[in-house]
Amino acid sequence: MVYEMLSPVPVKKRHRPTLVCLNCRRRKTKCDRGKPSCSNCLKLGETCVYSEDTDENASKKVRYEYMDDLGLPEFINMAPKGLHLLSKRSASWFNGLFSDIAICDRDPYLRITNAVIDILRKSASKGIDRSERDTVLQLPNSLKTVTMYNRSEKSEDQLYHQIAREFSALRSAPIPETYVPYEYEFWSKYYPYFVDKIHPLVPVFNLIELKDLLEKFFQRQKDHPGKLNDKVHESTLLMLTYLIINFFLLEFDSHNRLIQDHINIIKKWLVQSKWFQKTTLLQLRVWLVLRFHNWCTYHDNDGNRMNANDGLMGLIMGHCASLGITWQLWTNVDSDECKNIWINALHWDRKLAVLNGNDTFNGRTMRVPELPNDHLVLKFLKCCVDDPTHVNYKLAIEILNKLNFEEQNPMVTWEWKVIVAVTKLQINHGRLNHINEGISAVIASLEDLITLWNEHFIRPLAPVSYSSRIIEISMNKALVLLPAIILRARNPCKQKILQLMDKILTTYFNEFPYYYHVFKRLFKYKLTLNLINREDSLDHMLTILKHENHQVLEKLGITSKDAEMSDDDVIKVWNARFSFTEKVVNLKVEMMCKNYEPNLFSSSYQHALEKLEERHSAKADAIDVTQFLQQVFDSTDFDLFYGMDVGELPKMDSILP
């Protein structure tokens, strides 16, 4: 039987228009057919294309974004010793990837420097009688470490107890009673400044509605003086008036006692309120203003580790979620008022996460016109924070280079330039520790920072109380890692970087002496500069550690428990493991430094290192603390900075036996 090969019947294809967008069709997801963009594409930041919009093959017009070719990834270990959770009696805290402690932990040069500083500092405190309590000064609980020489914990704060009197005076008075500000002065002086300078940086209020609320508040206080009706949020409005007044005082009268009085009243009221249970839109706005205020003030700001307001930020982000102020505002709710609140909340969440190297409170993002860089910031944090031991260096730097804040407020644009520069400095420093090369990138990042510092001190952006804070933070980050650069460098580059560090220290302590966390770093940084300024500073420190704290060297793999090594052998082993051979490039940018008279940094602790090493080398069991402090404070000019006479300070004989 013969079978004929029949040609197949052609199948007629139906050409019907695709109703869903081509992106959803490709992803096989449900599409709501929204125009001009469906909700799925809006969330993902993609551009919708429908087949009915074009005669050509529309699938070719679906837009994709590709990362530039970065070549092979370069992974670095930014946390070779891990990240630590530290505790003391009053608090516990996690040190983020970009914290001062994390910077020091990943650099062997910084670890030995800090270890030697600790030895010298403890040598000075051996003669302190810890059974004798200090009854002279009355510092607040948050500053207990400075109140006595005799505390059981050893702290750097013991050595300059007396000069903290200014900080004691700020808070030693009892908390004042609430009061209503003078209305005419509020409207004529404080409120215009808030509208002109502060509100553009924290635009969470409708100014017309805000003015109406405050006018009604003052009128009710005239009708019923001394009574706060919380049914119409009078306590919240009173708190807002205190913050508005503080913004003006911080800029033009920063030593006014009213600033701290207002802070104490607000703290007391916050504890007594039910804000942890429920909130309103007005209260949430005031919290964001309080978050902004705490950044500006040197009284109760973010503290030494920039984490003092984490609880406040958690409260803000939590109540944003409870009120529906999240990313869904761009898909389901059309409220510009709520969007402004969410944008400002995200600004603080992202900024502090990048500065500390921590996770954000909200880990989602969308590509919306109001926040064009948010997805890049989160991508950078994911690259660095998810696994600090496996950071894609090239990708991290590439993302930082892509950040563009030119369309933002000029202050926000400038601030993020500083944040990006200081973050690059730390990423490049992490690479330097990982592969023991790349110091030119560290120097280039430092030059970018110096340029921004010079701009600030020539023509600071107002409000200065706000712009100064990021300068203080970035200067401290540079000061933390500069000793590692100096110890790696050789003459003449070493001397030039030492001169740079001296200029930064001089500017840092003379421009920001009233931040408590700055003030208490003074003694340590003075010792550090004098120590690394020695010609044989590295050998000198290794010798001290070999005799006094060999555990530090053992953790670095330098010494052995089974065999004693000579001082020269320790130095040879160090050079074999950590010696830096790359040539250090010269700085191309000059740090501008004013001629400060008096100079707080140069005039303090003149003989501190000499006296400490003298006592340490003598291996005395105890030291004369009175004599030591007389040497330390011999030529200080704190009376001009803190409005007090050093001669009137409590005598050591009245504190120590």
Curated annotation (Swiss-Prot):
Electron transport found in the keyword field: no
GO terms assigned for molecular function: DNA-binding transcription factor activity, RNA polymerase II-specific; RNA polymerase II cis-regulatory region sequence-specific DNA binding; zinc ion binding
Superkingdom as given in the UniProt entry: Eukaryota
Subcellular location: Cytoplasm; Nucleus; Mitochondrion
GO cellular component: mitochondrion; nucleus
DNA-binding annotation, residue ranges on this chain: 21-48
CDD domains, alphabetized: fungal_TF_MHR (cd12148), GAL4 (cd00067)
Ribosomal protein found in the keyword field: no
Pfam families assigned to the protein according to its UniProt record, in alphabetical order: Zn_clus
Keywords (A to Z) from UniProt: Cytoplasm, DNA-binding, Metal-binding, Mitochondrion, Nucleus, Repressor, Transcription, Transcription regulation, Zinc
SMART domains registered for this protein in UniProt: GAL4
GO biological process, one term: positive regulation of transcription by RNA polymerase II
Residues passing through the membrane, by range: none
Family in the record: Belongs to the OAF3 family.
Function: Transcriptional inhibitor with a significantly increased number of target genes in response to oleate.
Protein name (record): Oleate activated transcription factor 3
Lineage, highest ranks first: Eukaryota, Fungi, Dikarya, Ascomycota, Saccharomycotina
